[in-house]
Amino acid sequence: DRSPSPEPSCLFAGTIYELKGISYLVEAFTHPSLSHVQLFIAGNGALRERLEALSTPNIHWLGSISRAELQQHLSTAWFLVHPTLGDCCPNIVKEARVMGLPVITTEEGGQTQYVQDGVSGYIVPVRNSAAIREAAQKLSVSLDKAMSMGMERHQECRRLLDVKQTVTGCLSRYHTMLYPR
């Protein structure tokens, strides 16, 4: 169950290095137009110290957190931001969508399978702080809007990511490869 925070908040979870697009995220959230949105950053990495020094009071660095803490942050966040420069298919996007969060992400990577632009989140260009900021502004206007977008295609994502269905699909593919007709 979700219990979103009363004020707009969002989450980034991942390794703090360039491929994740984290510097563009921090740049977006240091802009005065997002000072009312709390950004929680879970993870550690090479860029953390440098980016933390640039942060404004609305950016909170959590470091490495437990699975339970991650679930708690997913439960209270209005949305997830994953501004990757190139990810195969990040688990955090899948987890967020299964929990009913809208996601701001880029067109680079497999996560676009779970996010429909303008419907269940926003797909922004890579390396574009202004686009991240604009999408975050849209999602932070109203909790009702964020919740509504999060529920779009929610059941479809749950079905796609169901463990039984995933295992059955993999076994079926292996069977087809091993025993071609």
Where are these regions (language model features)?
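Aromatic "clamp/platform" in nucleotide-sugar-dependent glycosyltransferases that forms part
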Residues: 85
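Short alpha-helical donor nucleotide-sugar binding micro-motif in glycosyltransferases
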Residues: 64-65, 72-77
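Short hydrophobic beta-strand element within catalytic cores of glycosyltransferases
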Residues: 102-105
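Nucleotide-activated donor-binding/catalytic signature segment of Leloir-type glycosyltransferases, i.e.
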Residues: 49-68
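A conserved mid-protein helix/loop that constitutes part of the nucleotide-sugar donor-binding site
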Residues: 8, 12-31, 41, 46-49, ...
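Conserved acidic donor-binding segment of nucleotide-sugar-dependent glycosyltransferases
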Residues: 117-118, 122-129, 138-143
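Short alpha-helical segment that forms part of, or immediately flanks, the ligand-binding pocket
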Residues: 71, 90-98, 112-113, 119
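A charged, aromatic-enriched C-terminal amphipathic alpha-helix characteristic of glycosyltransferases
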Residues: 144-175
